[in-house]
Amino acid sequence: MHQQLKKMSLIGLILMIFTSVFGFANSPSAFYLMGYSAMPFYLFSALFFFIPFALMMAEMGSAYRREEGGIYSWMNHSVGPRFAFIGTFMWFASYVVWMVSTAAKIWVPLSTFLFGTDKTQTWALGSLTPTQTVGILAACWMVVVTFIAVKGINKIAKITAVGGIAVMGLNLVLLLVSGAILLLNGGHFAQPLNFTLSPNPGYQSGMAMLSFVVFAIFAYGGIEAVGGLVDKTDKPEKNFAKGIIIAAIVISIGYSLAIVLWGVSANWQQVLGARSTNLGNITYVLMTSLGATLGQALHLTPAASALTGVWFARITGLSMFLAYTGAFFTLSYSPLKAIIQGTPKALWPSVMTRLNVNGMPAAAMWLQCLLVGVFIVLVSFGGDSASAFYNKLTLMANVSMTLPYLFLTIAFPFFKAKTHLDRPFVIFKNRPSTLLATGVVLLVVTFANIFTIIQPVIDSGDWNSTLWMVGGPIFFSLLALGIYESYRRRMASGALVMEKIGRAHV
């Protein structure tokens, strides 16, 4: 396994990027919120965020191809250690929020696989509400994941491979079945084509549509995570940049195509208008509709068509459960590795950086498990309904995920100003193109977050949601500053002591 990772092929790198970035559940969420009108937003985010940002990562990764610290090393060499630590810590924190959200969401596909539909909103342990029950299960899930992950990277890689194959299979099913339905129905779309107006009443205001940009950006998140693989890629000076570019183009086209394909089988008002539909179960609602519509197009009986839809949902539930599991195992280790093993060891207590017999920072992983578990319990016992619970967690993850991109983008002009680097791949060949790309990406990410944060207040005076979205990132930023300043003072104090000892000997 070590040798395979050490020399990853171009195809292997592309597949790794694809499975890290392309989430099958993102296009159903987009169709639910915006219908076909989500596609222009996804294209906009691809052109003005994802593709230029991916090219920046390709340049930095190729230049720092021998570094093992991933994005921490890139920002450290480009700007400085304090900036790099705060940015990397925020990146790590965004994945903590992602784990809080996903540990709750993962029970929806499992329920769908077992029962043919989402039953999580009816689950109850004793006197606990469904939301509290899912929260307890999510905390237990985090313990199980950590217990297995600390046993070594081989265990993580095997589980991740299964998840990657599962999600790629789902994308193939959507493409082939939608194509078959379109042919059988004479080119008729269940949802009339309209790329300018959302069928969702809650996403027809200008403010709501602008806030949707953050969902599109979130869909393209994760490409920076492959930064730690650059030194394990075969001929990284050529293949790393090439892999990122190919994957970025395929992903950009793939999302837009998927959004259109959902309209082949699902009419928004008929399929998605129910109160029980939310961002947590939308994928399974749409896949049920896909299977049922295929049955109808094949002129099966209503009962047979409905049964086809149920089995599509069950297969999707199993595939999504495996995909979430694979992603969960990878992201419970990879960001933590960067923040613990990529940064100076003196930043952390020695027990945090100590590796177990399997080469894993076990103590740090268990502490992360505790942190995620506490957040899960706090949010799930907050009194929200299950639907609001899922939607709030999704918004928290969207905002937190996009903030680290600001740090990486700000670091890029400083990286370009370095004159001593061997740069095997250069796409931004002069200062104006560098500043233009940096400025565009910064504007897109900044305004997307601002619109998302203020939208609940403008639409309904909902300060609670706004405070939840703002509070998490601020807390982690202040925590990062506190940790780094404590480290800096300890280093300065140690240097002063050594200087006094040296003078005493003189």
Could you describe each region identified by the protein language model?
Residues S73, I249-F328, P349-F389:
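TM-loop-TM module centered on a large, flexible mid-protein loop between adjacent transmembrane helices
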Residues M1-P40, F44, F50-A58, Y64-R66, ...:
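Membrane-interface "cap" regions at the ends of multi-pass membrane proteins
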Residues H2-K7, L355-N358, T402-I454:
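C-terminal membrane-solvent junction of multi-pass transporters and transport-like membrane proteins
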Residues M90-I106, A225-L229, A303-S350, Y405, ...:
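Membrane-helix boundary/coupling elements in multi-pass transport proteins
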Residues S29-P40, T122-T131, N154-G163, F375-L408, ...:
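Transmembrane helix-loop boundary segments of multi-pass membrane transporters
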Residues L55-M57, E67-A138, F328-P335:
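Hydrophobic transmembrane alpha-helices that form the core helical bundles
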Residues M39-P40, T122-L125, P130-Q132, A161-S305:
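Helix-loop-helix junctions that connect adjacent transmembrane segments
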Residues G135-N185, I244-I249, T394-F407, N430-V440, ...:
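Membrane-interface loop-to-helix entry segments
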